């Protein structure tokens, strides 16, 4: 970054490591690829009975569509995520192009989104602002959230997803 932008920006990755563990500041599960029913269901199963805590770490989830949002509500998935401290947002493409939940300056954001457009995820390097973005799978994001923001792979935890499979009815249309 210094080679490209000179002294305009400063990246502080060392502040994200405490006691040998890497910490994220923000987590997002969103968009047409991230906010699927299955991803949100698995995230809720991982988060069940746990919390993101009340410190600096935040997490938001954007269902991929209104029918998915409705199904997560009917099957208690949204309820379990909310109880864990996850903020449920409307079905919206914003996080992919930087219009929702952009990371703070020097914030480390873990995201399951479709895209990470250059300079859209909170970064404006020409103005001295840079964010740190790691694209991850929804399950590892939930594992990280359940672990207080410590970067955690979903393969490192045990959980069972007992939610109903996704189905949608168009009889009301």
PLM regions: where:
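Accessory "access/gating" subregions that flank catalytic or transport cores
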Residues: 1-53, 61-76, 80-83, 90
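Structural motif
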Residues: 25-27, 57-60, 86-88, 107-110, ...
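Structural signal for hydrophobic packing residues in well-ordered secondary-structure cores
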Residues: 44-51, 85-89, 114, 118, ...
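Flexible, glycine/charged-enriched surface loops at secondary-structure junctions
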Residues: 53-59, 151-161
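Short C-terminal domain-edge/linker segments immediately following a structured domain
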Residues: 57-60, 90-93, 140-145, 163-164
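A glycine-rich phosphate-binding loop feature that marks nucleotide/adenosyl-phosphate handling sites
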Residues: 62-65, 94-104, 157-167
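Conserved small/polar residues in nucleotide/adenosyl-binding loops
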Residues: 171-172
